[in-house]
């Protein structure tokens, strides 16, 4: 009788008729060296017929236990993160650094804030308002010590687009809606922080973020060209209407604003790049916006060129308390509020975590999100529009060696002094100077280096970058975000439902088994297929896994090259060490697969499941179904045992050899491999 002609059922029945016999008779002729097998300890499920139900109260047991352990100091640190650095502040070491960093960022923020307010379709003073109260509040409630918050270009463009279809920029309603938007954004950020939902943003690919940001930067830059050209262009978040209006108004082109704007832009770019290239001159990077403002204001005040439009009168004094109005438009603004909240998570939390890692302290992204929310809520009570973390100002703050949130308080003081004493001077600032500051700031957001990197490394991510940036350019920022997020989620779902599965082979001279496609020298054995599943197994991917296993069973010649010739697969070994989780649907599907294998005389073996996976399998009854003797600690143990059966098919007394080795799972079962009872195998210490 050949090995292939013996079914599992026949072998099991032979075991029941074979009797106990002496152990020495179990050693097949010609077998001289025992196989060493490490016994796999199976979990005790005698008192756990089914997984224990989890009481509703236990779901929050971790939180309640943590709350009970919290002391008064812990509560203060949680509610007011600033106390973490206040208690340990080293005045002699930190104050000078924080002072210089705060002044540097403040000097940079004043012109930027006015520029971004113009981008949002608001009077410049509202940029300063958005840089005042939110900065102070964030210094108290924010957990990052280097993040610089305030108006940013991308959020300003989103505000302009959201409000453009509701109210004209000259209307008071436009301002009221921008302030209401800050309140809505703050509420959403607080809710997400309290519910610890910051992890949702992980589903958005970095290539999507880069493509969206790059396209938005191009749109922002083009929208500011009107101040260089001297005539109005279409307000749009799409590139085509902007370009068409630029071409259509070419006959209105004026040289003075173009020359002044271009000159200031060149100066800004040179100072920025020199400051980044040389550490001893990094102050130039922060001073660049102020330099552009001073230069433009001086030219405008001295020469009074009539074709260059100026900012005009700016109210003097600090913002007054007022509650946001126009709540009847709140429902219309909710989608934009959600979008700005997403940008805040991407931009602010991403920067804050990177800076925290660089400065070696822990940062909770949910606490950070809550701090941003409080800053926007309180800011909206003092005429601020949505504020978030800035790439450029945070980088300058960190490069200036800011140590704590005190630098943010000093930045707020600089803004307050500007509101109290400097606003009369701002009326002579040319519009083209503010536009140059915006263009200079967003030019660094066009991430063409990332596109080149993605093309070289990962074509799929490059396609994501290209799709997102193209859709954003031609169909608008909102559509671009939705499409980018949709593609990100589609890729996540595809990867989850189609996990990587590898056929393993043995590396020559070792007991190590690796992917045969990655290691061509690895060899496998005829009649045995070893499959590694590199993901959790659950309802969404179990069907794909079963289909792949069936493919490997059919394509036996493709994956085998050593051992005795057999006409089909007799053993399938599942290497489950990478499997971190398995759900009930997957377990039921594996049980069905085992029964399917059984009808075709194929034995299933499982290697190295982790504790949780092993426990789930045991509770489902699969261990008893397959047999405890077919669960192994190592792939090599499973292969050696399977090889014994394959090799014994050519030895004398085949029936007895097969019978004793294919002992039924219900007979002589123990917590260790049943074959360990035979002298053929020994336990490896």
UniProtKB/Swiss-Prot annotation:
Residues 15-26 have a biased composition (Low complexity). Residues 1-23 form a transit peptide. It holds the Pfam family Sulfate_transp. InterPro entries: S04_transporter_CS, SLC26A/SulP_dom, SLC26A/SulP_fam, STAS_dom, STAS_dom_sf. Induction: By sulfate starvation in leaves. It is a multi-pass membrane protein. CDD domains: STAS_SulP_like_sulfate_transporter. SUPFAM superfamilies: SpoIIaa-like. Residues 518-642 form the STAS domain. Residues 15-53 are annotated as: Disordered. It comes from the Eukaryota. Expressed both in roots and leaves. Belongs to the SLC26A/SulP transporter (TC 2.A.53) family. This is Sulfate transporter 4.1, chloroplastic. The gene is SULTR4;1.
């Amino acid at each position: 009788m050949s090995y292939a002609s013996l079914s599992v059922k026949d072998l099991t029945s032979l075991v029941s008729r074979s009797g106990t016999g002496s152990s020495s008779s179990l050693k097949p002729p010609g077998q001289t060296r025992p196989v060493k097998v490490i016994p796999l300890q199976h979990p005790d499920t005698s008192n756990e017929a089914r997984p224990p139900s989890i009481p509703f109260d236990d779901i929050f047991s971790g939180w309640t236990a943590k709350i009970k352990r919290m002391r008064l100091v812990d509560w203060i640190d949680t509610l007011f993160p600033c106390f973490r650095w206040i208690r340990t502040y080293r005045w002699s070491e930190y104050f000078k650094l924080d002072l210089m960093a705060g002044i540097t960022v403040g000097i940079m923020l004043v012109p930027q804030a006015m520029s971004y307010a113009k981008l949002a379709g608001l009077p410049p003073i509202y940029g300063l308002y958005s840089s005042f109260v939110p900065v102070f509040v964030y210094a108290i409630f924010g957990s990052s010590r280097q993040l610089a918050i305030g108006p940013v270009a991308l959020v300003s463009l989103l505000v302009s687009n959201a409000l453009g279809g509701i109210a004209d920029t000259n209307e008071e309603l436009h301002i009221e809606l921008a302030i209401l938007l800050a309140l809505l954004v703050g509420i959403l950020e607080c809710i997400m922080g309290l519910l610890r939902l910051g992890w949702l943003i992980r589903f958005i690919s970095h290539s999507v973020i880069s493509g969206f940001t790059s396209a938005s930067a191009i749109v922002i830059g083009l929208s500011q060209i009107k101040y260089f050209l001297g005539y109005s262009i279409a307000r749009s978040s799409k590139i085509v209407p902007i370009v068409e209006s630029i071409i259509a108004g070419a006959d209105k082109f004026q040289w003075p604003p173009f020359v002044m704007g271009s000159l200031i832009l060149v100066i800004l770019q040179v100072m920025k790049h020199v400051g980044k290239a040389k550490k001893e001159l990094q102050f130039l990077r922060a001073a660049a916006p102020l330099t552009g403002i001073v230069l433009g204001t001086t030219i405008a005040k001295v020469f009074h060129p009539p074709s260059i439009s100026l900012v005009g009168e700016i109210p003097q004094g600090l913002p007054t308390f007022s509650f946001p109005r126009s709540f009847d438009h709140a429902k219309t603004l909710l989608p934009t509020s959600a979008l700005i909240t997403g940008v805040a998570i991407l931009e602010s939390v991403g920067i804050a975590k990177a800076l925290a890692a660089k400065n070696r302290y822990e940062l909770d992204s949910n606490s950070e999100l809550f701090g941003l929310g409080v800053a926007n809520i309180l800011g909206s009570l003092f005429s601020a529009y949505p504020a978030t973390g800035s790439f450029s100002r945070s980088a300058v703050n960190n490069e200036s060696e800011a140590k704590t949130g005190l630098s943010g308080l000093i930045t707020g003081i600089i803004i307050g002094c500007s509101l109290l004493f400097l606003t009369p001077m701002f009326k002579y600032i040319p519009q083209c100077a503010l536009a140059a500051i915006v263009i200079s700031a967003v030019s660094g957001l066009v991430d063409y280096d990332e596109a080149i990197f993605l093309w070289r490394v990962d074509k799929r991510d490059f396609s994501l970058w290209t799709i997102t940036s193209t859709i954003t350019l031609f169909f608008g920022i909102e559509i671009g975000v939705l499409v980018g997020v949709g593609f990100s989620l589609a890729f996540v779902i595809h990867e989850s439902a189609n996990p990587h599965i590898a056929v393993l082979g043995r590396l020559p001279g070792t007991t190590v088994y690796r992917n045969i496609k990655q290691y061509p020298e690895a060899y496998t054995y005829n009649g045995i297929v070893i499959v590694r599943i590199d993901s959790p197994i659950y309802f969404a991917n179990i069907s794909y896994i079963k289909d792949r296993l069936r493919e490997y069973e059919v394509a036996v010649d493709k994956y085998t090259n050593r051992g005795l010739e057999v006409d089909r697969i007799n053993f399938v070994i599942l290497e489950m060490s990478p499997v971190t989780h398995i759900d009930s649907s997957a377990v039921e599907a594996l049980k069905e697969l085992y029964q399917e294998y059984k009808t075709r005389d194929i034995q299933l073996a499982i290697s190295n499941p982790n504790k949780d996976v092993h426990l789930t399998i045991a509770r489902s009854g699969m261990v008893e179904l397959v047999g405890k003797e077919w669960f192994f600690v190592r792939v090599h143990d499973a292969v050696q045992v399977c090889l014994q059966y394959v090799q014994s098919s050519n030895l004398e007394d085949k029936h007895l050899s097969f019978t004793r080795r294919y002992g039924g799972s219900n007979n002589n079962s123990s917590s260790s491999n049943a074959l360990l009872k035979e002298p053929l195998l020994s336990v490896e210490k």
